[in-house]
Amino acid sequence: MAKIKIFALGGLNEIGKNMYVVDIDNNIFVFDAGLKYADDSMLGVDYIIPKYDYLIQNKKKIKGIFITHAHDEQMGALPDILPELENVPVYATKFTMEIIKRELAESKINYSKLIEVKPHVKINFGKISVFPINVTHSVPDSVGYVINTVDGAIFYTGNFMFDSSMLGPYKTDIGKLAYIGKQGVLCLLSESMYADKKGFTAPNNRIAPIVNEILDQDDRIIVSVFPNQFYKIQELFNGIMHTDRNVVIIGKRLQDIILNSIELNYMKFDVNKIKTISHVNDKNIIVLIADDREKPFSNFLRIIRGYDKFIKLNKKDTVLFMSPVFPGMEKSSSKLLDGVARIGCNLIDLSSKYLSHHASSEDLMLMINLLNPKYYMPVNGEYRHEIANKKAAIIAGMNEENILCKLNGDVVYFKNGKLVDDDIKIPTDELLIDGEVGDVGEIVLKDREMLSDNGVVVVVITIDKLTKKLKHQIEIHSRGFVYVRDNIDVMKEAVNIATKVVNDNTKPNFIDYNKVKLGVRDELGKYFYNEIGTKPMILLIVQEI
């Protein structure tokens, strides 16, 4: 009999940032380590990851981090967390591991504990074992993980859907799922992102019919994609192979992933059809445009604004928008679509018309029927998605009291195979990551918001080194605050206020710099707010000459 704790450090009540912990008698198993894309209001923040203090504090108990598939939301936090977890092993299938290695190399991280797993090959940890099972998702080699315990199995689905037409590295092993169900499942952790959508996701995930129509058109075709949309890119390539069109790829990450996938035989395409940037203006060319994970749409927005030196959009172009729009990215995607429309291109937006490879309500119910779990825990979705997942589970025959809708940090505790009503909470938070400086923090983010909204005022104070009196008139410069020529009187009065503060805190051969700095910021802040209605960030440069 075992003591089992299940909780999320990220991934509940949100899209992305997936990180789920299963603690079995102090043996810790971590499933996924993902990021979440920053929303448009998070100035200078590239992405967000779960705060992983719990993992650092318990790293000696961690048996491994198990990654379900090669999407940023599942593996994007690894470059940030692994350096502090030392020799914790990372387990993933072949294709997923190739992408992990690429991301770590890009971040200049040399990590030796990377262990490739094969679907349906058990990984033993004493009395506990982990068993990967193939599932269908938009990237090859996607898996869910079964954790076998003495009290029954725990199954984490990762992202999945059911589609009998999928083959090879995209195929779900339904037989293995049914077998696991017959052995007894204590708890099923199942994704929620499309739980509010009726029916099965298939065939609404396939874009081949519309792609083939688009390829029949004349002139150049520009396609906006995310690097992780492997199956949709493959559908596009399948269509291109039946035409005389060639491809130019813009975005180093996308180019590397596509070429690596072709080399490993995970993507089928004639590499001779991939041309250099010099062909970007050919009439029959297909231009694939993607970005690094930190700056979604940045390459395309640069092109729309006319800043790209290689490619200019024109009215003859067809623009195919395939990129998914994650929560918080609506403003950027709207700018992109509006920009294309203003140029007059033929715009085709597939982002909301075709589903991604996530489980809709019928997919969720089929998974429940195959596994017949005692308890059910909706994961990977905003709270409304978790509730929709709960409703699907009830329709599938689950008892409502056995459906566990939780928030990050809420612990589901099983003792000897029974749910214990114990109000345990693990502290959780998130880290805001700037690719250049690491964790940004709330204070820095607020400063950036203030700069964006109210501008900055720089006050330059020059003090005589000997007398400690003002050597020159105080200078005040502003950016993003007011147009100086239209507010000369305001700026003159600001100089007078700052001068008075300096003089009030100066004695013969002595000046109280702390009072000067605090006083100037305080008095100018009040003055600007009363006169202009905004309070800019006020920076002081105090120098002695």
Provide a role label for each language-model segment:
Residues E116, L288, L539-Q543:
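Extended hydrophobic secondary-structure segments that form protein cores and membrane-embedded regions
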Residues N509-K517, R521-I545:
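C-terminal tails and terminal domains of large nucleic-acid-associated
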